[in-house]
Amino acid sequence: LFQSEKGKNTMKDYLVRGMSMDGFVKVVAIRSTELVRRGAEIQKTTPNATAAFGRALTAASMMGNMQKVENGSMTLQIRGGGPIGTITVVSDAEGNVRGYVTEPRVPLVEKYPGKLDVGATVGTNGTITVIRDLQMKEPYIGSTELVSGEIGDDVTAYFAQSEQIPTACALGVLVDRDTSVKVAGGYILQLLPGAPEETVSALEAGIQRAGAVTPMLEAGMTPEDILGQVCGS
């Protein structure tokens, strides 16, 4: 379903970007394990902060890469009122990112044993803000209220509400028992204007069928594999 523009099949971090064969869906996927590991080491994050910060790093890398403005940059800021405080990540047009959190040493909160509660760490009483420097006089600034604090849902809602682009964003960071990052990655799919209903339906079914990103990454799937699974090719 998609034609990747770049990417190589190694276990190193990399990103693929492409378009569906019918030209109605823009796709990007990333393996960001080493990026998240490095970010966690620098920030000295506890597991919940690692998961939240890692998701933000992953999302920002894809969002920055999607801009296609050579010297542009994109800043993703998430402020939800939770114990982590504010998450700020800046990406260049290649998807290289840097970022920080105001409180890296947050307490352990689980939805159930073995499942970190990122939403509780980030909070839901706040906003997701995107600042795009597109090498013009003024940067573009968009902001929407947080939906869940899980970050993927919030990025999805941001694009739909602030930029009017129907989007699906899925992010995953698996923190191992020794608090190291086992795998990290994600994908963003965006519908372009004029997409027929059958494209929308097929995409929705593919997202449901594929399920969460983390198990796919843990199974060793590449970004291309994940897009194939979600897009049904």
Model regions and ranges:
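Contiguous, function-dense segments enriched for cysteine-driven chemistry
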Residues: 1
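Interaction interfaces in information-processing and related assembly proteins
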Residues: 4-232
